[in-house]
Amino acid sequence: MGTTTSHPAQKKQTTKKCRAPIMSDVREKPSNAQGCEPQEMDAVSKKVTELSLNKCSDSQDAGQPSREGSITKKKSTLLLRDEDEPTMPKLSVMETAVDTDSGSSSTSDDEEGDIIAQTTEPKQDASPDDDRSGHSSPREEGQQQIRAKEASGGPSEIKSSLMVPVEIRWQQGGSKVYVTGSFTKWRKMIGLIPDSDNNGSFHVKLRLLPGTHRFRFIVDNELRVSDFLPTATDQMGNFVNYIEVRQPEKNPTNEKIRSKEADSMRPPTSDRSSIALQIGKDPDDFGDGYTRFHEDLSPRPPLEYTTDIPAVFTDPSVMERYYYTLDRQQSNTDTSWLTPPQLPPQLENVILNKYYATQDQFNENNSGALPIPNHVVLNHLVTSSIKHNTLCVASIVRYKQKYVTQILYTPIESS
């Protein structure tokens, strides 16, 4: 009763709402109301009104905080359900909470969805990791094997099959000998092993690709070139040794074995080819005077080795006649090569001094390209004779396999 007096506006609402239960209570007990006295009826009606007002005030108090503090109520219900009903599953708890709290459905659904997601997402994330760590599909295993084969080096295996073993030897003394060259890109030094039988001799075996390789020796911290190996010059004019590596010749026995293996792997022949093979195996005598014809090949004369040197290599007269006839056939009776030239060959070209020795030479040099000069004139100053009051000075420089000729024409005043 104290709560209703402090809020007169709520009293009116509660009285209006509570008329129905009062009438219902009175209707339910008509016999008692008729049999009791007026004083007893008044006391009973007062008690009934007090009970109804208390019920309405409790329901009104319970309805107001549902709108103001829905979140706090929800938290309390979750905590009470977790403590009071530990045996109930989480899914059923969430469903009952949604059914009971119809006023705050939007906020409660979001919070409940977050809770369910938090409990279920780790399981979903953990299952593929466990599967990947424990088991892998055959497709992934095949990809891993292919990657391992690629990492092992497919091109390197091809190169190793083409490499040829080569022995490099140094025979000019020294205590420590190393070799470096184009096969190491001039960056690494490979130590040579001394020979136990021969003092001052070193050797090493390398596997190199076919081609030309240049190298130099480092003997006691000094760059040197072997006199027992072919020598050439590099781009800077320094002497280097070189070696030409060739692919080994194929062994005929191995080829025969491979051909037999290839024949064994061939598919079965057709009917016609099998008949042809059977005809080849038939006897030579066909009857009635017909026989198979076999051509008798003349045997080759046996060859023998001899120590006699032919006269063309020992007799000077025979050698001179032999080379003279060869040159005559090649030059078509041109004997100009027998006389020495007045100038070096590079200065007799059309580009240099407009001079032609013969008409044939003009026809040969009409392309405008100079012939390959001799190596002794490289990096030298060459001059020609003064013609028409003009002096010609030239120099030739080589870069790899190209030759560059620079010509300077200087006029000379006649005194």
From Swiss-Prot:
Molecular function as annotated in GO: enzyme-substrate adaptor activity; protein kinase binding
The entry's keywords? Cell membrane, Cytoplasm, Lipoprotein, Membrane, Myristate, Phosphoprotein
Q: Among its keywords, does the record have Transport?
A: no
Pfam families in the record, alphabetically?
A: AMPK1_CBM, AMPKBI
GO process terms (BP): cellular response to glucose starvation; filamentous growth; invasive growth in response to glucose limitation; regulation of cellular response to glucose starvation; regulation of protein-containing complex assembly; signal transduction
SMART domains associated with the record: AMPKBI
Indicate, by first and last residue, each region the UniProt record lists as having compositional bias (Polar residues): 55-69
Which residues carry the N-myristoyl glycine lipidation?
A: G2
Classify the protein's membrane topology as the record does. Answer: Peripheral membrane protein
- Protein name per its UniProtKB record: SNF1 protein kinase subunit beta-2
PANTHER family to which the protein is assigned, alphabetical:
5'-AMP-ACTIVATED PROTEIN KINASE , BETA SUBUNIT (PTHR10343), 5'-AMP-ACTIVATED PROTEIN KINASE SUBUNIT BETA-1 (PTHR10343:SF84)
Basic residues compositional bias: what residue ranges? 9-19
Where does the record place it? Answer: Cytoplasm; Cell membrane
Q: Which family does it belong to?
A: Belongs to the 5'-AMP-activated protein kinase beta subunit family.
Q: Summarize subunit and interaction data from the UniProt record for this chain.
A: Component of the SNF1 kinase complex, a heterotrimeric complex composed of the catalytic alpha subunit SNF1, one of the three related beta subunits SIP1, SIP2 or GAL83, and the regulatory gamma subunit SNF4. The beta subunit serves as a bridge between the catalytic and the regulatory subunit. Interacts (via KIS domain) with SNF1. Interacts (via ASC domain) with SNF4.
| Posttranslational mods | Phosphorylated by SNF1 in vitro.
> In this UniProt entry, which cysteines form S-S bonds?
none
What gene is behind this protein?
A: SIP2
Query: Do you know which InterPro entries this protein is assigned to?
Result: AMPK1_CBM, ASC_dom, ASC_dom_sf, CRP1_MDG1_kinase, Ig-like_fold, Ig_E-set
Region Kinase-interacting sequence (KIS): list its residue ranges: 154-335
Disordered as annotated region, ranges: 1-43, 55-158, 249-276
- What species is given as this protein's source? Saccharomyces cerevisiae (strain ATCC 204508 / S288c) (Baker's yeast)
Q: What else is known?
A: Present with 300 molecules/cell in log phase SD medium.
* Mutagenesis / variant outcome for changing G2A: Changes protein distribution from the plasma membrane to the cytoplasm and nucleus and alters the cellular life span
Its domain of life reads Eukaryota
Q: Its biological function? A: Beta subunit of the SNF1 kinase complex, which is required for transcriptional, metabolic, and developmental adaptations in response to glucose limitation. Has a structural role, mediating heterotrimer formation, and a regulatory role, defining carbon source-regulated subcellular location and substrate specificity of the SNF1 kinase complex. Involved in the regulation of aging. Acts as a negative regulator of nuclear SNF1 activity in young cells by sequestering its activating gamma subunit at the plasma membrane.
What GO terms fall under cellular component here?
cytoplasm; nucleotide-activated protein kinase complex; nucleus; plasma membrane
Look up keyword NADP and say if it applies.
Answer: no
